[in-house]
Amino acid sequence: MTITLVSILLIVIFSFLFFKSIRKWNTWLYLGSAILSIVSFTQETTIINMGYLGLSFFIVVMFVTLLDKSEIKKRLMGVRAELAVIGSIFALTHGLKFIVFSIDFSFFWEAPLYFYIGIASVVVMLPLFITSFMIIRKKIKGKTWKKLHQLSYVFYVLVGCHLILIQNSRLAFYGVIFGGYGVMKCLDLYKKHTQAQPKNTKLTHAN
């Protein structure tokens, strides 16, 4: 839990202070993240191959959309795509590490449920990851891209279930994070719905 919280704090601070540089040098950041991931893959346990760092990036990506309008939201939203790509690189490393581990120790077909949910989350993440690169995104129609990225909510649910079903000492922490996000997202959608109703009423009366 401490590792995740510290990582989240550092990601937020770094993104707030260097948001312009992150956008400008995103390709190099992706390359650096990939190199770190490759090195991590060869090690027994690191914060990358154990999934902590990827999770931290995604928690920031999840919650930034729910912040009230402010300078911190403006800056973090400006690099949200970059943070999602970096988080995906680290999450992919975590997933591949445990898939290889399960094959090496012959328990791939006898693993706990959370293992397969984790694999499912990686499968859902892949199209989101690929289409987050601007060079790919530019080739996709805006509506199509938005519809595809609705899968991000499926991804969040799968990750939450994966972590909660592990039932380790961080169970309560994961429950608060993902349960809290679910409640906040529902409240945010309700707020937007109620704000849109008066506008629709005015349009109806005008017609």
Short names for language-model regions:
Residues 1-207:
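Membrane-embedded alpha-helical bundles that constitute the cytochrome b-like, heme-associated redox core
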